[in-house]
Amino acid sequence: MRARLALAVSGVDYELREVSLKSKPDELLAASPKGTVPVLVLPGGQVIDESLDIMHWALAQNDPDGWLKHPLDEMLALIAGNDGQFKQALDRYKYPNRYTLESDGDTQAFALAQRLKAENWLAKLEPRLSLGWLFGNQPSLADMATLPFVRQFAHTDAAWFAAQPWPQLRAWLTYFEASALFESVMAKHKSWQSMI
């Protein structure tokens, strides 16, 4: 989602191909053998297959909302924490059955322990959001790179999330989910079919 956010806000023309990861098209695997999404194939054939790299590329083309105007090293440090400790805990909290070797068979206790790790990360974000966004009063690369993962976390147990002492975090997420940008990237698309 975060790659789509940056592509959309940049206004760069691109062709979206929604693919089923259960039946990966040969074209996807030819472009990026690791077979994950997103993948951006540029007109010259260069392939960018990491979402954060796609965000950087799109915003380097056009950054009309100033997502890159804040100190890049500070934003990247925050994103690294999100993509590292928080994302690891999120995956294990949301899908504990995928980590049975790590859970010693008690997936429920394992999921709750992972939720606690994720909570610690989110608690650090709460005071940063006093002006509405992570780096002040306007969205930044850091906001748009982290919000999709915070959204996944919140929707894993929405009632529990709503009861947490994070009013600024919830307001941030609610504003994002109500935005036209979010709606535009969440539009459903048919799976692309190869012509071969």
PLM region descriptions:
Residues 167-196:
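Long hydrophobic alpha-helical segments typical of transmembrane helices together
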Residues 57, 156, 185:
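Residues that scaffold the ATP/ADP-binding catalytic core of kinase and kinase-like folds
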Residues 1-112, 119:
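GST-like domain detector, emphasizing the conserved glutathione-binding G-site
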Residues 74, 78-175:
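GST-like fold's C-terminal all-alpha helical module
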